[in-house]
Amino acid sequence: MHLIIPKHPSSMVRVFFNIDASVGEKAQNMKQEDILLVQFFLRQIAEAATSSKPGGEARRQRILNVPISGTCDAATIDGIRAWQEGRKEEFPNTIVDGRADSARDVFYVKDGEWTIADLNGIFRFLFPNIWPRLQDHPKCPPQIKARLPQLL
């Protein structure tokens, strides 16, 4: 896990937490803190948000099944896929592959966002009072809390 400053001028976040290795379907799944970060973002966003779009609540329920365990399992992959399916409705170029890759900026193609950058942006929107101090969230995993002072 590391911080990145996006180059894109319209970025919804000025800085975001990036993963070092891919997480999800056919991914590296090498770093527990990367997996924890993706799981934490998915779960907290799903717990804090509601959906009014058709199919949105079913996707939210799939994301709520994601454990915050640091192990990439079928529920984590399905949660990533559910997130991407929902975002594809708004950003048609979003790739739905059940995988979060390390981002090189916010967008990978016009209107297609890196999953990890998008998760950062929505988390920031939902929790503006603590952003970027993830460690202040009551459900932040201990491994993430321990790592953040080195990054911020």
Where are these regions (language model features)?
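Cell-envelope/ECM-targeting effectors and their regulatory/trafficking segments
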Residues: 1-152
